[in-house]
Amino acid sequence: MSEQTPAEAGAAGAREDACRDYQSSLEDLTFNSKPHINMLTILAEENLPFAKEIVSLIEAQTAKAPSSEKLPVMYLMDSIVKNVGREYLTAFTKNLVATFICVFEKVDENTRKSLFKLRSTWDEIFPLKKLYALDVRVNSLDPAWPIKPLPPNVNTSSIHVNPKFLNKSPEEPSTPGTVVSSPSISTPPIVPDIQKNLTQEQLIRQQLLAKQKQLLELQQKKLELELEQAKAQLAVSLSVQQETSNLGPGSAPSKLHVSQIPPMAVKAPHQVPVQSEKSRPGPSLQIQDLKGTNRDPRLNRISQHSHGKDQSHRKEFLMNTLNQSDTKTSKTIPSEKLNSSKQEKSKSGEKITKKELDQLDSKSKSKSKSPSPLKNKLSHTKDLKNQESESMRLSDMNKRDPRLKKHLQDKTDGKDDDVKEKRKTAEKKDKDEHMKSSEHRLAGSRNKIINGIVQKQDTITEESEKQGTKPGRSSTRKRSRSRSPKSRSPIIHSPKRRDRRSPKRRQRSMSPTSTPKAGKIRQSGAKQSHMEEFTPPSREDRNAKRSTKQDIRDPRRMKKTEEERPQETTNQHSTKSGTEPKENVENWQSSKSAKRWKSGWEENKSLQQVDEHSKPPHLRHRESWSSTKGILSPRAPKQQQHRLSVDANLQIPKELTLASKRELLQKTSERLASGEITQDDFLVVVHQIRQLFQYQEGVREEQRSPFNDRFPLKRPRYEDSDKPFVDSPASRFAGLDTNQRLTALAEDRPLFDGPSRPSVARDGPTKMIFEGPNKLSPRIDGPPTPASLRFDGSPGQMGGGGPLRFEGPQGQLGGGCPLRFEGPPGPVGTPLRFEGPIGQAGGGGFRFEGSPGLRFEGSPGGLRFEGPGGQPVGGLRFEGHRGQPVGGLRFEGPHGQPVGGLRFDNPRGQPVGGLRFEGGHGPSGAAIRFDGPHGQPGGGIRFEGPLLQQGVGMRFEGPHGQSVAGLRFEGQHNQLGGNLRFEGPHGQPGVGIRFEGPLVQQGGGMRFEGPSVPGGGLRIEGPLGQGGPRFEGCHALRFDGQPGQPSLLPRFDGLHGQPGPRFERTPGQPGPQRFDGPPGQQVQPRFDGVPQRFDGPQHQQASRFDIPLGLQGTRFDNHPSQRLESVSFNQTGPYNDPPGNAFNAPSQGLQFQRHEQIFDSPQGPNFNGPHGPGNQSFSNPLNRASGHYFDEKNLQSSQFGNFGNIPAPMTVGNIQASQQVLSGVAQPVAFGQGQQFLPVHPQNPGFVQNPSGALPKAYPDNHLSQVDVNELFSKLLKTGILKLSQTDSATTQVSEVTAQPPPEEEEDQNEDQDVPDLTNFTVEELKQRYDSVINRLYTGIQCYSCGMRFTTSQTDVYADHLDWHYRQNRTEKDVSRKVTHRRWYYSLTDWIEFEEIADLEERAKSQFFEKVHEEVVLKTQEAAKEKEFQSVPAGPAGAVESCEICQEQFEQYWDEEEEEWHLKNAIRVDGKIYHPSCYEDYQNTSSFDCTPSPSKTPVENPLNIMLNIVKNELQEPCDSPKVKEERIDTPPACTEESIATPSEIKTENDTVESV
């Protein structure tokens, strides 16, 4: 022993090392990594001597690993067993069952599916008995697990059957009545008999079987109970194929089948010998049995997986099997069919066992019992019918409460324990069923097959089959149910698609989250209760999961799910009202559907039906939008309807078409300012211009955008306000389909409610249109007027590049008006697009798109911030009804009480509506509603007047603090007005909306201010005093008037006192123009980042629309369309409050004080409300009592709307006024100075400045009334406005254009100049904030691929850049075809020089190769030429050929092409051969001869002369002097020639030069 000790010690050490190494590697196997598993397998093979230790390590790891990490370890075991085998196989086999069960118990459904697949590969590896034991054990945990029966030879070899037992067995199975029960009864005695007869050799095997049998016996007991349940379920499933509860009786039936199989399995071993002996004739029976077994849904499922047979195939097979099956099998089959969907899922494993069991039983029965299966079948069908009747009764109970049914059934059996087990198994089955959705589908189709049994189901199944007879249908149906009705109807469409897919896919589609036992659910509608049992959140979760999976498969589904979610939240309130109608519509759902949480889809549907009068559900819109399918949204019809009011054959004169709205409005306002036209005419013209351009825009957008309905412009802007907001398309805001439109209050106001819309200012050159129908969505409270807000960015925006477009759904009816903030369209990239009806019930989401591409888009339910990529940036989701903290973002009133989705309560805690983001209950609620103290209900964001809001500082922040959300809504906490501060994350470019009111502002001015980042683009921030929102685009425009422009809505600062919104652009924004200047004056555009206000010349008091503090209410009041109720606008009383008051006197709705009130001194108006309380700052006394304030409500819409809408006086006033007021400073915004502002009723959207005080007539409510283009055209011509293009254009246009664009250009230039050079990369400089740099990042044309921006002057570069992208994409695709390379390291210069236009390397290469190629070409060409002259055919052989000039003999070579000898480097001229160079020289010299004599050369040939001379010298030596003389003479001649020639040449050159 001592000798062995060292060896043992060494072995032990090696073992420890191997185990340690293996353990450490094994612990790293936390996910399914094939390389890692392969490595561990190889390691195991290398350590084969330590197989037992390694196996124990693996088993221990399997036991202790988290459930998510168990499967990889099982895969490792599988890999080792299959690849190494030997000792490992033996070692793993010992504890295979325990290991497998350990994993199976703790993992989820998806992992169980993987385990099933894994188990299915072991038949050839592990002993069949071990696998059988494993199957039985797993089946006890999950009845859906199929038990693969042992082959007959294994059974016979291991078990000797007592002949007595053989005699008994046929009898027992033959008992027809108790199909299941008899086996259960007979089995127990059978086991002891078998034991007695077994030889000891087989005792061990028998013990294993005995354990399995015990399990089977338990299952048999369950079967009895389940038979009863199955009967009940037949009726239920047939009558209603809806979700079943997890506990579901449905699961029980599946158990029945499972359990039935086990009993049969128990008998099977015993019967095997019988079959061998007596039933050798059994083949026919076996065939029948096989067919019968095929009926088994599980078997079908298997066949689906293995053979991919389609359902129809299976159905035929089933029919055949049914006809052929034994009575017993037929009975079981019907029940199975009834439960088939369930069974299929739960019993995929049992299919096999059932087959054999059925075969055995059928054989024994057929022998002992009546031989005619048909009779049995008939009797069986009768039984089934009876069962059906029972099941029908039960179905009612089930509908009420599936659990109740279950209990009753359980009671009948009196086996509570069994019931509990059943439930557990049912739950497990449910999981499995999810896995086996395909089976369920089959089951659904099978249901029809059964003789008459399925008739009840037929209605349901037919529906589902209409959707697709394929298996997928049932699953889809299930899903839809589980989801809630909404998905149902959509599902009807999607199922077909899904069904077409392969069964596997279908299964996959069935998300595990789907309600348990999807199959069952389908079959038994009663089980709907299960859904109820699920908590809504779980349902939602499931839906979300399902939707994600389904989305992949079915775009339609995806749309629905997306829509559903947002709607769910928004509609949850509405669900109450809409629930019943939906139920009626979808009566196939049980009444519980009402209780059940309704999907947004259903609710919307009901609402829409009610509101839209049977218009198609918005879902469709959304679907069309999301799927980009052209499904018309209900809006489309609306648009058509509205458009009908416009002549179909409407012809617009070229001048009008070519004219820019901005110019027309500007000119019109100028005419008004100069007194050439009256206020009324001005309003009418503006209104008509607006209509005309809206109509044109709508047409263009429709052509341009795939989802016309989604964009507010598409719809005629003028839509009846009456229509439910739902219809309004504007909901583009939500990004969701129109559903999300903000709904204006119920009234859909015409988009331009009142002249305000038309107000030139809006349309004015700046085109900053802040217009919203009064009622449209951004309704700042006006109860009537949702006032959509349309803030069109700088004139350039529509026509120009105005970065900001705040556009309410003017076109939207009913406040569907979405806010649409679009940043400058062009380069700026619309930094902010706030669009979509905000509160739209339907969809209500905001969509903020920041220039950067941030898209802040909320579904109705919530805001959804999407990052530039379109990826959801953000956390802010406002959804849910107010009570519900939807989306997790919950805005609470100061008290902290959850106001509801976003609900800002007053400080008092009353849910005043602060910011209430909720779908309006009615259409009206939808819009963002800024409710004043009135607290009018209205969904959407409700900015309530400061009063109510007091102090509620809201901070609308994306997920808190999350910049992404970008919205920061924070109100002044202290402000009474509760200024809202809506502010995007500052740093955040995109989001930008910062709605933040100045702290002090009374009236809670809102400050809507985009993130400081340029992206933010919009900052609406109302000075305190100025309750108005101040839209200050961060970088975006500042809507302070453009200098040249009439200040369309010049800065929307209300008069100072007035809270009117002030639109200011942040300084950085290049685009933004500030429309502060009086219209006539060019106010230098003020691009201030800060809301600097650019007041027109100081004198113009009005120019800045700061309304005197007194006006303060939110100065939204001014604009009817948008009304910020912060102050109660309704109250007409002037604001007497001291500045300090934060609009305590909401009562004074906006007061428009007389101009006199307005601070006449420019300074006064100058106040930006925001300063301090701002109000206090106002030089004018706050008391504005004198002014007429607009009635709040009247103004309501106008408040915002009025920016654009401000009644002409307002808007116009503002704008016009800006023109007028600006021009007539004293005039309060467009209102006559002395004139009072009359409250504008929502009907009169515009404030009319009526000296008499009478309200000027508002634009006709018939907003869609035909635009009398000819009348408008004639008016424009008459007033000279249209001549602008010719005459006025020279003056006004040119001046305006020069005033505006040039400033923009200057701005761009200035900004460019302001951009600091940061290339030295010093930390201190980089830490500083450079607005110009940020602005630069968000200005210019943006590349759709990479987001790079190019200035308008770089269009060529942009084109090159796009070409570069194309090349890059091509090279990426071609990478596989060619070898590519790059340098390992790039130098700084590479980075700096690199530009996404052309790869410098590529460019250099291409140039290089081109040059090389050119050189090669030239050389080849030259060579070719040379060859042409070089080769000259040689003379006759032997002839000596030499150059005529140099007399050098030519070299000869063989020209293979011509196959003859050639003289190399020779040319033949006139029959003589020369060297090319010699001949060239000769030619050159001869060209100098002035008058070369052709005959002279040949005669005087130098060679001949030389020869002659030589000869003469030889003959006459004494003549040599003569020869010399001749030689001497010749040179002089040459010299003379050469001298003469140059002179000639010079002459020629001179001539040329002179020429």
UniProtKB/Swiss-Prot annotation:
InterPro entries: CID_dom, ENTH_VHS, PCF11-like, Pcf11_C, PCF11_charged, Pcf11_CID, Pcf11_Clp1-ID, PCF11_helical. Residues 1303-1315 have a biased composition (Acidic residues). It comes from the Eukaryota. Keywords: Acetylation, Coiled coil, Isopeptide bond, Methylation, mRNA processing, Nucleus, Phosphoprotein, Ubl conjugation. Residues 307-317, 342-364, 380-421, 427-442, 529-567, 599-615, 716-725, 1519-1529 have a biased composition (Basic and acidic residues). One of its GO terms (cellular component) is mitochondrion. Residues 167-186, 266-648, 707-732, 749-781, 1056-1081, 1127-1147, 1159-1187, 1289-1315, 1516-1555 are annotated as: Disordered. The keyword Chloroplast does not apply. Signal peptide: none annotated. Residues 475-486, 494-508 have a biased composition (Basic residues). SMART domains: RPR (SM00582). The modification N-acetylserine is found at S2. One of its GO terms (molecular function) is mRNA binding. Component of pre-mRNA cleavage complex II, which promotes transcription termination by RNA polymerase II. Associates with the phosphorylated CTD domain of POLR2A /RNA polymerase II. This is Pre-mRNA cleavage complex 2 protein Pcf11. It comes from Homo sapiens. The lineage of its organism: Eukaryota, Metazoa, Chordata, Craniata, Vertebrata.
